[in-house]
């Protein structure tokens, strides 16, 4: 298992949240350009969370599967494939997948460590200040 690093806090966290907001907004603007129906947004925006099912096999498998669905490479490749092959639905679905990731980052949900679902590179949705301290900083 991997020991989680301290949670990102302060200005770096705000920059990472801004990254998420920019990704979310950009993906939705590009989605609009695909001329796909807007009902797709609520229909599929949460589908990447199905990658949480990996946790049924334990925290190590769960973190790996979850991170596979919540990192940029797969949805970026899907979006690129849709654009290159002139397949608007594939492009739209890839963009909505990226929008989901942006939404998660904005809400402070990050990539998972394999110690538990709550330990992320962003410290979870509401990290406590004590989570941000290094183990050596904690009183013994």
Segments predicted by a language model, with ranges:
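N-terminal membrane-targeting hydrophobic helices
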Residues: 1-140
């Amino acid at each position: 298992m991997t020991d989680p690093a301290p949670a990102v806090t302060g200005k770096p966290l705000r920059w990472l949240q801004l990254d998420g907001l920019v990704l979310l907004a950009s993906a939705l603007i590009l989605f609009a350009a695909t001329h796909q129906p807007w009902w797709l947004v609520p229909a599929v925006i949460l589908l990447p969370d199905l990658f949480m099912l990996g946790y049924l096999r334990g925290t190590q498998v769960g973190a790996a599967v979850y991170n596979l669905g919540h990192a940029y490479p797969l949805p970026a490749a899907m979006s690129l494939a849709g654009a290159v092959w002139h397949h608007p639905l594939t492009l739209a679905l890839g963009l909505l997948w990226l929008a989901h990731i942006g939404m998660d980052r904005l809400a402070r949900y990050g990539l998972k460590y394999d110690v538990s679902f709550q330990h992320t590179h962003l410290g979870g949705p509401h990290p406590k200040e004590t989570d941000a301290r290094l183990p050596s900083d904690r009183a013994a």
